Amino acid sequence: VGFLALAYPDAKFFYSKRDARATCWSNYETAFAEGNFYSHRLEDIVDHYNRCTRLMQFWVDLFPSQIYTFDYEKFVSSPTIYGPDLFNFLNLDWSPFYLEVSRSTTEVTTASQFQVKEKIYSGSSDQWKNFILRIGTRFSNLIE
């Protein structure tokens, strides 16, 4: 981020934040490609999440006018408000059609390949709560 922000002072960056517990649980449930061994243990995921969060906060503090912190929960609850805000930050035109992701025929090859073909919804952010007994205190050190 730093090199790009300095090399391209007009560059804009999009930083998507989601509930820390939902993010960590989603990582735990996902079978990532080889080399992502941190995602096999909740303790390692929490450590990885915290390191990423601290690093991103460093960049946000250093380049506040170039980095847009996008609140995932706010977006899924009010996409017609928060979608246009992001596009405005990026100096792009907004269209309500962008919210009709379930109509897209574009191939998706990410861990979210099935979810992105559905309508925007907020239910996945609470899935971790179904496993609270299994999770125990593993999320107690999370940075929000």
Language-model regions, residue ranges each:
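Conserved adenosine/adenylate-binding substructure
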Residues: 1
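Conserved phosphate-donor/acceptor-positioning beta-strand/loop module used by diverse small-molecule
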Residues: 4-28, 86
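PAPS-dependent sulfotransferases, especially Golgi type II membrane carbohydrate sulfotransferases
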Residues: 27-69, 77-144
